[in-house]
From Swiss-Prot:
Residues 183-192 have a biased composition (Acidic residues). This is WASH complex subunit 3. The keyword Transport does not apply. One of its GO terms (cellular component) is WASH complex. The gene is washc3. Transmembrane segments: none annotated. GO terms for biological process: actin filament polymerization; exocytosis. It comes from Xenopus laevis. It comes from the Eukaryota. Keywords: Coiled coil.
Length: 199
């Protein structure tokens, strides 16, 4: 015995005289543990399934939006030759965990207009040498606004339907450097329409 009256070695209890644990209580404890564990796992699985279904729905929405965007971009002529310079991220920024969320406007260079302008300049020079007085579709004010709509990304079918409603030839959208079928009257009509706006 030590100072507190406790045995130095062992508990001092004769284990042969201790009554056994009741089996019914042991079974009840085990059953309760199993039930709580199963309920927890069921709740966890349900929450995971809900989050995965929400994520799947969000991915489907993004895919649909991406398909619409690709369709709009494919309707713009001349984007096949667009060159985009990849943004170079320094390794120090990556190691520090600083990743830019959006590329800077200066780091990404998209030049569809410059490519289109260079191609159009060559074609325009040839056509100007052949005929200087012929009005092209791109110069005609009635067709120019529809060509601008195509460049902005408005769906081509909607533009063609609007052109048909206004009595214009929608096939001329694909050939902006072609001569206007009724050249001079269009210039007169456009000047009339401009004067009506100025009044």
């Amino acid at each position: 015995m030590d100072e507190d009256g406790l045995p130095i070695v062992g508990s001092g209890i004769d284990l042969t005289k201790v009554p056994p644990i009741q089996q019914k209580r042991t079974v009840a404890f085990l059953n309760q543990f199993v039930v709580h564990s199963v309920q927890f796992l069921n709740r966890f699985a349900t929450v995971c399934e809900e989050k995965l279904s929400a994520l799947s729905l969000r991915i489907q929405q993004i895919e649909t939006t991406l398909n619409i965007l690709e369709a709009k971009l494919s309707s713009i002529p001349g984007l096949e030759d667009v060159k985009v310079e990849a943004q170079h991220i320094s390794e120090s920024n990556i190691s520090n965990g600083h990743l830019p969320s959006q590329p800077d406007a200066q780091s990404v260079v998209v030049s569809p207009q410059s490519d289109n302008n260079s191609m159009n300049d060559g074609i325009l020079q040839k056509e100007e040498a052949k005929s200087e007085n012929i009005t092209t579709v791109s110069k005609d004010p009635r067709y120019a606004r529809y060509l601008k709509m195509v460049q902005v990304g408005v769906p081509v079918m909607a533009i063609k339907n609007k052109m048909i409603a206004e009595g214009l030839n929608p096939d001329l959208l694909e050939t902006p450097d072609a001569p206007v079928p009724d050249g001079e009257p269009e210039a007169e009509e456009s000047s009339d329409s401009e004067s009506s706006f100025s009044d």
